[in-house]
Amino acid sequence: MYIISHPHAQENKQRCFVATAAITANQSFEIAAWRPRHNPWLIALTVTLATFMEVLDTSIANVALPHIAGSLGASSDESTWVLTSYLVSNAIILPISAWLATRMGRKRFYMSCVALFAASSFLCGLAPTLGMLIFCRVLQGAGGGGLQPSEQAILADTFSLSKRGMAFAVYGMAVVVAPAIGPTIGGWITDNYSWRWIFYINVPISLISLYLTHRLVEDPPYLKQEKERRKSIPVDYIGLGLVALGIGTLQLVLDKGQEADWFSSHWITVLLALSIILLVTWVIWEWRHEHPIVELKLLKKRNFATAMFFMFILGAVLYGTTVLIPQYLQLLMGYSAVSAGEALAGGGFIMMLMMPLSGFLVSKMDQRVLMSIGFATTAAALYYMTTHMTLGMDFRTAAMLRVYQVAGLAFIFVPSNMLSYVDVPPEKNNQISSMISFIRNIGGSIGIALLATFITRGTQQRQTYLSGHMNDGNPRFRQMIDGLTATLRSEGLSPSDATHKAYARVAALLSQQASTLAYTDVISALAVIVACLAPLCFIMKRPPKGLAAPSLH
């Protein structure tokens, strides 16, 4: 007690405090001042190459499933595990990629992911059986899971604040454009070569990415220090197990739920309950743990929490409609898979133009205003879609509707990514990137599952409603049946056959109209949800002007 109260001891304590503060300030300055030795744009293109390839693989295999099933002697239901296995392993790696990058070193982790992705892609192409292909897809998903968050963290450290918007725009082009053109590329490769080449094509691109990453990418000093510090910290095996099992079972439920008719399936119900229990337990455990795998306490940061919410909605809208629109074109309008993919491709190309524009604007105007414009534009485009989605629309109309729908997404993606780093220390960049990528992908999975379910239920409800008006007591219905019967009789059918066929045609038309109304109902609901988000953008804080970069991360 005497030592603490001694005047000299107090003076020494104050000096230590000042010295510690000075060291912390110097470290923050060094973190902010650090820049890689090589051209940042070469680094951006290098890491974007692998990310584009990985995101492309989430959708490129969709159109090849019938060919894969036929080649390997599998049923259509069995072949869907080629997609599910990839998505499940990918979803498990995403939230823990920040922890892995910190323990291994981000560059080493990133290169390991690219190498695993390349090797497993080659093995996918060689797979002699469906079981082997599914196993290789699990490895491929695990390798791909670390690429998106690692790239975003690398870009955040590589670029100064003033240029980060354009860097995130480059990243956005990979994440947003790849799913849009994946089905088209997959269909073209499958039709002209073989389904195996949708996997082989990854190998040379991965090797180029590996070489360029080795030569150009480097870990910042703070990350090297964090890696050394982590060596003495015990691994949170319980948190690791909980998140892996919880996310894995949730992704499995989302991917197979609609196919199994959700809660009418016992195994889906059990898996969903298990995933909820595991994830709730994981959140409680991680929140209290001193050294968690995923630092959930970052959600106390207003900007980051808001960005997570926005990215969840963005994922649901982007990936949900990427599945929804081709489905509508194929099932109701008779498009082939390739033609449906081509209708979406225009949206991908417009995103390639809008992303750089958004990257330029974030440094010129209030990012919150830009996001608000993005939400308002997207909501208006979704509503516009509902007024033009008919069974008689042509290919040009379908393609332009997709262009309108995605044009505003760039104004959401880039500024929300930028603002998510406000008030977050640089050493947490890996965590921010990992959680943003994870929530966007989970939003996509949940969006796809919910939209598909609502369309199925909505079609049934609309069909029941319309059927109530289809009876012989309705003059218009009677007139339609009589007209069709007369037309069919003129083609040589007997009166009874013509009548039966007329009723069958009306029933088919009723089913198509019910489905169309269900699609427009779902898209209208999306438009309302997105429109409500426009004013919420102003919850986020702007980056303070004139402050050093560390406080802006």
Short names for language-model regions:
Residues F199-H214, V243, L271-L278, D521-F538:
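Symmetry-related core transmembrane helices of the 12-TM Major Facilitator Superfamily/SLC fold
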Residues Y2-A50, E54:
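Cytosolic juxtamembrane N-terminal segment immediately preceding the first transmembrane helix
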Residues V203-G248, W267-V270, V294-K300, Q460-S494, ...:
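Central mid-sequence intracellular linker of multi-pass
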Residues R215-V217, L254-K256, L278-E290, F454-T459:
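Structural signal for alpha-helical transmembrane segments and their membrane-water exit/capping regions
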Residues F168, A180-P183, G187, T321, ...:
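Small-residue-rich alpha-helical segments with characteristic i,i+4
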Residues L94-L240, F349:
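Helix-loop-helix hairpins in multi-pass membrane proteins, especially solute transporters
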Residues H38-T102, Y110-C113, G125, G131-I134, ...:
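Transmembrane core module of solute transporters
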Residues T20, N26, E78, N441-C532, ...:
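Hydrophobic transmembrane architecture of multi-pass small-molecule transporters
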